[in-house]
């Protein structure tokens, strides 16, 4: 199953013009809100911590094995005549990364559905950003609105849950997984006759078997769709038939 490195901003000194918090604060709220969606969609993740930096996040990701690197930021116009006047969302990707470009375009198309100025949601190639240039897997750095613009800052603050769902939906699309809404995690017990319960990479009998859960073992259910549960069992994630799990 897919595994991503999730890197919300660690820039606590970038204050929102509203005074409600910082870039670090709101991007970590966004990452918090994404976690249930990622688990429900069998996307495993490692996440940086606020005391880290972009450089240490990149280094931590380099020590692991990931299918994607996602950095969450909000933007600023900088000093000068445009300060506080710019708006929009930018999905940055590395120019020669086909999958980075594909992911950026998926994020853009989905974010256009919830951002009030869809024409200002764009994808852009760059070699200047470390979190785009240095990760080994395909990567995207999202600049989600301008925190020095009042309208953008308020939009972010009021739409953390909507943005989290939207980004998670984009990740599911990128990994060719059906999007599943999260449920309150529940412990389930495998109730096969004797055999272990197959765990599949996709919620269909044609889905690849990626592991199994022993008879009478307990697993955690995160979501459900059409007779399947999305679940976790130790380090194993995937989909199991719901009739073989007692909640």
What role is predicted for each listed range?
Residues 29-39, 98-116, 153-181:
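Long, well-ordered alpha-helical scaffolding segments within enzyme catalytic domains
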């Amino acid at each position: 199953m897919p595994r991503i490195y999730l890197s919300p901003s660690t820039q606590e000194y970038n204050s929102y013009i509203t005074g409600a918090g910082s870039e670090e604060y709101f991007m970590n709220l966004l990452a918090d809100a994404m976690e249930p969606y990622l688990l429900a969609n069998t996307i495993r993740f490692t996440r940086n911590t606020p005391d880290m930096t972009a450089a240490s996040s990149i280094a931590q990701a380099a020590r692991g094995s990931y299918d994607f690197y996602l950095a969450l930021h909000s933007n600023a116009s900088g000093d000068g005549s445009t300060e506080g006047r710019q708006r929009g969302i930018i999905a940055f990707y590395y120019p020669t990364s086909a999958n980075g470009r594909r992911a950026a375009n998926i994020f853009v198309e989905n974010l256009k559905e919830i951002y009030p100025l869809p024409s200002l949601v764009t994808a852009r190639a760059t070699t200047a950003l470390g979190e785009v240039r240095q990760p080994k897997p395909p990567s995207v750095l999202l600049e989600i609105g301008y925190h020095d613009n009042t309208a953008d800052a308020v939009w972010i603050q009021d739409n953390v849950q909507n943005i989290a769902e939207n980004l998670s939906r984009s990740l599911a699309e990128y990994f060719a997984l059906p999007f599943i809404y999260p449920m309150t995690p529940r412990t389930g017990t495998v109730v096969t006759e004797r055999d272990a319960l197959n765990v599949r990479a996709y919620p269909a009998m044609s889905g690849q078997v990626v592991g199994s859960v022993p008879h009478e073992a307990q697993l955690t259910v995160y979501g459900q769709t059409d007779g399947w549960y999305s679940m976790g069992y130790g380090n194993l994630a995937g989909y199991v038939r719901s009739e073989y799990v007692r909640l």
